[in-house]
């Protein structure tokens, strides 16, 4: 059996502004249009499909596995845009990154309060005795 993640919806007050904001920070191409969606496509074929929501938006968490060079580029854009970032999801370590499982990671607040994260190694992927998330 083969099961792959394909897409998820991201609720936004302004569909295109939110999709462009995320694309800009991540260094992705301009979103494409598919019906009511502004779509960001990733290298593995999965998509984030941004859709307008006029009601109260419940913030969600979206994490992206990135290479070391991409991490550096994204982190630079976050700093250039004067965005706050944290090493942890509880906002205890502002302006720092984590080194979970021997990689690097950080969190920032994206459009409509969604919590975005980049990591260079999946959590839980370190060898026994490896570094833990800080």
Model regions and ranges:
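N-terminal beta-strand motif that seeds the catalytic metal site of vicinal oxygen chelate
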Residues: 1-17, 61-62, 122-134
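Core segments of cupin and vicinal oxygen chelate
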Residues: 2, 9-48, 52-55
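Short glycine-enriched loop/turn motifs at secondary-structure junctions
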Residues: 2-4, 55-59, 99-100
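Residue-level marker for the onset of beta-strands and adjacent loop->beta junctions
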Residues: 6, 26, 36, 60, ...
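Vicinal oxygen chelate
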Residues: 16, 64-115, 123, 129
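Short, flexible helix/strand-to-coil boundary loops that buttress conserved ligand/catalytic motifs
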Residues: 22, 75, 120
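Residue-level detector of high-confidence beta-strand sites
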Residues: 31-33, 88, 118
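Conserved beta-strand in the GNAT
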Residues: 48-51, 107, 116-119
């Amino acid at each position: 059996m083969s099961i792959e993640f394909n897409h998820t919806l991201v609720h936004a007050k302004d569909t295109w502004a939110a999709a462009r904001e995320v694309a800009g920070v991540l260094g992705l191409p301009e979103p494409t249009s598919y019906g009511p969606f502004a779509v960001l496509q990733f290298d593995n074929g999965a998509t984030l499909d941004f859709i307008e929501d006029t009601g109260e938006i419940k913030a969600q968490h979206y994490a992206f596995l990135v290479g070391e060079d991409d991490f550096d580029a994204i982190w630079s854009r976050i700093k250039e845009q004067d965005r706050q970032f944290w090493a942890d999801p509880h906002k205890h370590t502002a302006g720092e990154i984590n080194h979970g499982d021997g990689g690097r990671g950080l969190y920032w607040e994206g459009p409509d309060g969604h919590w975005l994260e980049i990591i260079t190694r999946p959590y839980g992927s370190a060898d026994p005795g490896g570094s833990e998330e800080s």
